[in-house]
Amino acid sequence: MKKKILILSGGISKERLISLDTGFQVAKELKKNGYKIKISEPDNNLEKNIKEFKPSVIFNALHGQFGEDGYIQTILEQYQIPYTHSGPIASSIAMDKEISKKIFINNKINTPKFIKYSFDKKSAKLIEQINDKLKFPVVVKPINEGSSVNVYICTKKNITKILKSMESYKEVMIEEFIAGREIQVAIMGNKKLGAIELKPKRKFYDYDAKYNTNAKTQHIIPVEISRNKLNEVMNMALKAHKVIACRGVSRSDFKFYRNKFYLLEINTQPGMTKLSLVPEIAAYKGISFIKLIEWILKDASTKR
């Protein structure tokens, strides 16, 4: 008899629509294969839904704040029901770009230089700081956000205006801009699944390039790179997965410039939409969408 799966999707983050799509795609595939499914929001009805449905596994399809930052994971561990993806600590670390980058640096994983900018401690010498430590252009991004939400490439001319528009975040990361190729690597368990290159039509692989079917981002698999370099970037992704203590699947985002890889961030709950990269990499490796989902479910546990 097939298991009963409760799928958590939606939420209140800016990635709500992506989460709903991920939940829908996973539910659709599982239903086709005979599983009993219930989709639930992470709201006040969650406990009621869990008690009434009595799921064998909870599939966490949430993205963004409260979904992949350790918050919901802490709640799920109290139910003593196996759930998918990374646990509270790994999720909170990966979601915090400042902490995760410091861990990368401490473990000799190459990552772009950065400074943290707090709006309650505004620096009159910000331009000097950037010129001294980073150089323009720079990338400005929220410290705790995913899917390239509110990520901007800034010049000396527009950075003040961009920062003004982001004051609701309280603090942001200002990172050196790395030109070059976009390489994404998927890890499955503690094994290297594969890599894919992205060629967006715009300057970088932003939210629109990721989820808009009209954005015409080119996906290249296999990556056109030497075997040694491919192994190098996949080893970096696996190392990042391990030092952050990720569980299940993860996806690491890299830039490749002047023969060097730069790890931008690691994603503990990569999307499962029709445009998502982990299912695409898995399919290239001969793992169907349902087999990928079933592996994630089998990997679930009560303590992550």
Short names for language-model regions:
Residues M1-M95, I99, S118-L126, D299-R304:
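ATP-binding N-terminal substructure of ATP-dependent carboxylate-amine bond-forming enzymes
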Residues K31, E77, I105, D132, ...:
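Anion (oxyanion) recognition and catalysis
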Residues T155-E232, F256-Y262:
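Phosphate-binding site of ATP-dependent enzymes
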Residues E176, V185-I187, H241-K274, A282:
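Conserved metal-phosphate-binding beta-hairpin within the catalytic cores
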Residues K2-S9, I93-R181:
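Active-site nucleotide/adenylate-binding loops and adjacent lid/helix of ATP-dependent enzymes
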Residues E197-S250, E280-R304:
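Active-site "cap" helix and flanking loop/linker of ATP-utilizing ligase/carboxylase catalytic domains
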